[in-house]
Amino acid sequence: MALAKELMGYPLITERSSLVSSASHFKKRTQSTQFSINPFDRRPRKTKSGVVAAISEDLVKTLRFSTTTGDRKSEEEEKAAVKFKVRAVVTVRNKNKEDLKETLVKHLDAFADKIGRNIVLELISTQLDPKTKLPKKSNAAVLKDWSKKSKTKAERVHYTAEFTVDAAFGSPGAITVMNKHQKEFFLESITIEGFALGPVHFPCNSWVQSQKDHPDKRIFFTNQPYLPNETPSGLRVLREKELKNLRGDGSGVRKLSDRIYDFDVYNDLGNPDKSSELSRPKLGGKEVPYPRRCRTGRQSTVSDKDAESRVEKPLPMYVPRDEQFEESKQDTFAAGRLKAVLHHLIPSLKASIVAEDFADFGEIDRLYKEGLLLKLGFQDDIFKKFPLPKVVVDTLQESTKGLLKYDTPKILSKDKNAWLRDDEFARQAIAGINPVNIERVKTFPPVSNLDPKIYGPQHSALTDDHIIGHLDGFSVQQALEENRLYMLDYHDIFLPFLDRINALDGRKAYATRTIFFLTRLGTLKPVAIELSLPPHGPKHRSKRVLTPPVDATSNWMWQLAKAHVSSNDAGVHQLVNHWLRTHACLEPFILAAHRQLSAMHPIFKLLDPHMRYTLEINALARQSLISADGVIEGGFTAGAYGMEMSAAAYKSSWRFDMEGLPADLIRRGMAIPDATQPHGLKLLIEDYPYANDGLLLWSAIQTWVRTYVERYYPNPNLIKTDSELQSWYSESINVGHADLRDADWWPELSTVDDLVSILTTLIWLASAQHAALNFGQYPYGGYVPNRPPLMRRLIPDESDPEYASFISHPEKYYFSSMPSLAQTSKFMAVVDTLSTHSPDEEYIGERQQPSIWTGDAEIVEAFYGFAAEIGRIEKEIEKRNADPDRRNRCGAGVLPYELLVPSSEPGVTCRGVPNSVSI
């Protein structure tokens, strides 16, 4: 019961104290408020009346010092003469699983605690001592009963400590913690009871390292937000000291226990010491512009002084200690990795026994029905051919019960053949996993922006004749004027890399353009696909155009062309829209926030849940996903040139001012400004599920952010003079995005509107934009023919030697163009992991410790209003998915669009909008 009251904001101590001359020594707040909210009830609540000093007899020892000279003491001296005790309730989160070493150290710490090597806390006032000019402090207090509770198995353990303070202490503003044990511990929160203003909350959520690793005391501040110029005098030095600790000095190799945030270039993706073929260019700098990543300080490689040495799995990559995954997240990710390893191992073994290519669609289907080992009944052959250790055999055989059996991707759930249809191919451009590339055709034929001296004529090979027969009676000009022509244009991003890509073993690609027509029903249909290769001489056929089929041969050609488009789309989705725009480009803002914004700063408190786990997942990506010979290189068409392609997109097209949803829709020609419409935009494709749902979330985020910002910045001068805020934004641009710092499109930060726009964009990218691009990867891409991540053969024409074999066995040629069994299984396992919500996911409209994350009751109330709006949006999306007039999300065999539904259960659900880029 006591714990429940503590979580609700009630004092733990209810007995009134009998203080000597309490009226003259304590000024009680008669109008103070203490916000009390059930974390599981999002209904707006009224604030309750204030809690006065609640100090029980057993905790209060009033020591009135009598005057010996008869002189009257000052009021300050009289207050200082009155001592009383207050209590801290300290919540520590236990690990669910410990290895042998951790268990031994835990027992040693329990013993050491008995003999005086304790956890020591010290309370610090918001006021300065008038004599010493230093912050007022309590006595040092020891955390009680650590040894006694060391065997407690509960997830959370509550300890207490007692402080002695005087009546002149003022309000608590900070608390220091010294860990004299050998083992770190996770400090979740501290609540102080006994002051007249009511309970004082310290939301900590941090690992506290042993004194032997980090000799300095840890500093935690209350949940009361302060702008820099409002910082109480007793906290100013501590505020700057804590920021200095987090910045470090830019030198040295980082230890896993460090809390230092700093910048570096992407020079750790290659492994030149292992092989020259694994050398990769440095990303970041004048030659190859790129955002900055978290600095680790590792030594350079032997063979390349500009390259940082690698940390290979299972060794962890450095991120600041509090950025590392929590235990349940680690377990979810580790399970996914095991599945990926086993899924990759079996096809690799199988490749030497049976053919590597799929024979037909049924063979792919059996991956979901039977699993890998059972699929062709070849498990006995593998175990005979490869004398594996018994433990490996047992593991593999046990795994066939589920781990090696793939879940059926959602794309097959309603109509397993829907993906073959042209209307579904087109629908996924606006309601699939990559709905952010489609653009309105403004000029036909399309025109390239590449240098014609290098890449040939800028005009497309597309002509009116190619598409006129598919425009439902419209002329091309009429279709343009009525906004009925749309396009996926991957010409300029792929063409500069094609010679190198097509020289790779088992990789073949085109630079594609796909033209869509918007029908009178509001659905899209593809009307032409242009396939381009780099020109190699005047007689070389570098461009060809395919149109919807008219016979069996053209049907197979058309299916192959759509597969090449989907492969282009998958590469740009992963390397540019997903990795670059929502992972890499956010990292500098996160690093700068920790370095420049105090935990007391209201903007840090706003951004905090939207930064969770991002540095860790980005570090893991550098280790195994985007690294040389990593998952992205092995699984996607661009291969070793994928990250260079990502860097080219950053240089040529990334603009922070265009990353917000409304600006992005306008830039792509998918919407026009219209003040009479909801959200101030008119969508030119009315049934555009990603944009329809995204605008609901964008507006909700924007309204919440505006309410928050206006609370702390009632006039623009406060923004201009906020040193921490300006330093954060400046460092994000000038250091984190240093290669683009001179661009004229960076928004200014001078007004409330400026700040609202910047923060809304960041929160949108971290939450809804990332969710729309990430959590459908397995549901849509887990069936590889729907979205092949790479292609292995070009499409033959009549002059090619392969044309005869294509005509004879088109299905065989089709599957030989697709990824192999080994490539497919590895890719499926990886995107399955990346599409998975962990049990500790925090979704938009949710926060840890929802009623105490800030001490501002008005803002807590506003946050619950925001959460209620998110709930209304979820119901609206469900309503839209049941509306038969919305043909792009409702109909026979049509998947509902749920990627922006805010909530989700754990697992692969194809829905859910987490607060942050956490996977």
Swiss-Prot record:
Residues 225-919 form the Lipoxygenase domain. It is found in: Plastid, Chloroplast. One of its GO terms (molecular function) is linoleate 13S-lipoxygenase activity. It is an enzyme of class 1 (oxidoreductase). Coiled coil: none annotated. Residues 86-222 form the PLAT domain. This is Lipoxygenase 3, chloroplastic. It comes from Arabidopsis thaliana (Mouse-ear cress). The gene is LOX3.
